[in-house]
Structure formats: C-alpha cells, structure tokens
C-alpha cells in the first residue's frame, strides 16, 4: 500500500484524457498533474528541446513525492520515455505501447492508421512497436499538426475545427480499419474524428489503454492507495493560464478542479 499520488505530465491539457480514464477505472487513486501549455505543442519542436522540457516536468512531479509517473504525451514518450524510465527508481509509463497493442487486437483487416504530432509520426515509433508484435500488419501514419493547438485553444467543436479535421484526415478515409489517436489531445476531438473516418473504423485511445497498465503496475509493486486513506486531493498545475486550463479540464472531467499556475 502506498498513499502517495500518481504523477501525470503532458505538453498541455491532452493528458487529461488519461486522467479521466484513471478516475473512472481507479477512482481511489490521487493525482498530481502538470501541463506545459505555455510551450505547447511539443510536436513541432526538436527532440532535444522536447527532452529538456519533459525532464523539467518530471523533476517538478518528483518534488510532489509521486509514487509513479505517467508520461501522458505521445511526443514525449517517443523522445525520452526510455531514458526517464531507466534513470528513476519509481515506475514510469508511456502511452505508445499500450495503444499499439490495443490496435493490433482491434484490427479486423490488418490496416492500422496512426495520427499524431509531427515528431511522433517522424519517430515512426508506432509502426516499430506494431511490427515488433505483428510484422504483417499495414500501418499508415499521418501527422496532424493543427489538432493539438485547436484543443489547447478550447475549440473542440467549432465549424473551423470540423473543417480542419476533415481536410487533414481525408487521406486516411477508407484505407484503415483501426485508427490510433496517437496524441492524448485527440480524444477531445473524438466525435469529429469518428464522423470523418466513419462508424466502422475503431478509434484507439492510447491514453485510455495506458490506464490498464497503470493498474497492473500498482498491483505488481503493491503500491495501491489504501481504501481508508482519507479524502482525495487532486492537484493540477499549468505553465499557462490556470483559468483556461480549468475551463477545459472541468468540461472534460465533468467536475470542478483547482488549477495552479507554475513557472518552470
């Protein structure tokens, strides 16, 4: 048993999609979340800068005495997860392998699509992980650089957003049977993405899949929070506007949250 919180980091609000799933599956666990919205999105940035920023977020979470860190950002996972996991003495999870595994299980026709930031797509990490498990599957990857900024701005269902999603995803329509949402921001656009891709395409939320791995590791290391540990005190931090973060966060999590601005 370990009553310390689980730490989550992301380039912005996208990691809240993972938090929402954790609150649903593991409602007794406490959360500390840091979103670097001031420097979002990470996708277009060079790898060394992503590495530097991610380590800053990790070190911030370590000051909060977390028992586990979840890199709830596909771009950061692709660039620096292995390094962070190797250097810390607490469990560190990324969101890519769980998403790849889930896509393989869901694909009926062996044609998997991956959408993500330019860095995630450029890294080719999803194709590698999928082919490590099943080399016969076809993988089509597409960078969607405009999606995360739309989510960060709170434009989740505007006509402009719908047009951008349609025009961006058009090359994949009719070509895949499963689509990995390879950025934790993208589930906030899920209804629009599903509408564009069609009802038969399975959408894979890499962040939500990650929560199953969190549960496994909590049990394996015997660090579940005690059921009698007292009330939960979730803490949310952002490097940008706490008001904007709270507005998106409360809409997505369907509960009131307290958000604090921090400088890194």
From Swiss-Prot:
Binding site for substrate: 10-11, 42-43, 74-75, 184-185
PROSITE patterns: ASP_GLU_RACEMASE_1 (PS00923), ASP_GLU_RACEMASE_2 (PS00924)
Keyword vocabulary terms for this entry: Cell shape, Cell wall biogenesis/degradation, Isomerase, Peptidoglycan synthesis
Single GO MF annotation: glutamate racemase activity
Pfam families: Asp_Glu_race
Active-site residues from the entry: 73, 183
Catalytic activity: L-glutamate = D-glutamate
Pathway(s): Cell wall biogenesis; peptidoglycan biosynthesis
Biological processes, Gene Ontology terms: cell wall organization; peptidoglycan biosynthetic process; regulation of cell shape
EC number(s) per entry: 5.1.1.3
Family named by the database record: Belongs to the aspartate/glutamate racemases family.
Function: Provides the (R)-glutamate required for cell wall biosynthesis.
Protein name: Glutamate racemase
Organism of derivation: Streptococcus pneumoniae serotype 4 (strain ATCC BAA-334 / TIGR4)
Lineage, opening ranks: Bacteria, Bacillati, Bacillota, Bacilli, Lactobacillales
């Amino acid at each position: 048993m370990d009553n310390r919180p689980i730490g989550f980091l992301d380039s912005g609000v996208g990691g809240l999609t993972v938090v929402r799933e954790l609150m649903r599956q593991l409602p007794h666990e406490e959360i500390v979340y840091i979103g670097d919205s001031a420097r979002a999105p990470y996708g277009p940035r060079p790898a060394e800068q992503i590495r530097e920023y991610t380590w800053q977020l990790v070190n911030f979470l370590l000051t909060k005495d977390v028992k586990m860190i979840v890199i709830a950002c596909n771009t950061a996972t692709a660039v620096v997860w292995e390094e962070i996991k190797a250097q810390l003495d607490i469990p560190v999870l990324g969101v890519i392998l769980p998403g790849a595994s889930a896509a393989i299980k869901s694909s009926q026709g062996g044609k998997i699509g991956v959408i993500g930031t330019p860095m995630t797509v450029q890294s080719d990490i999803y194709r590698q992980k999928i082919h490590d498990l099943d080399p016969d599957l076809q993988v089509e990857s597409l960078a969607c650089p405009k999606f995360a900024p739309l989510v960060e701005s709170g434009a989740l269902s505007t006509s402009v957003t719908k047009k951008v999603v349609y025009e961006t995803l058009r090359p994949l329509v009719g070509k895949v049977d499963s689509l990995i949402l390879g950025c934790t921001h993208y589930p906030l656009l899920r209804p629009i993405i599903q509408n564009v891709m069609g009802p038969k395409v399975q959408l894979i939320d890499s962040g939500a899949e990650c929560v199953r791995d969190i549960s496994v590791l909590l049990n394996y290391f015997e660090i579940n929070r005690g059921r009698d540990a007292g009330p939960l005190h979730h803490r949310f931090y952002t490097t940008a506007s706490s008001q904007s973060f709270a507005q998106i966060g409360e809409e997505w999590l369907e509960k009131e949250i307290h958000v604090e601005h921090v400088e890194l």
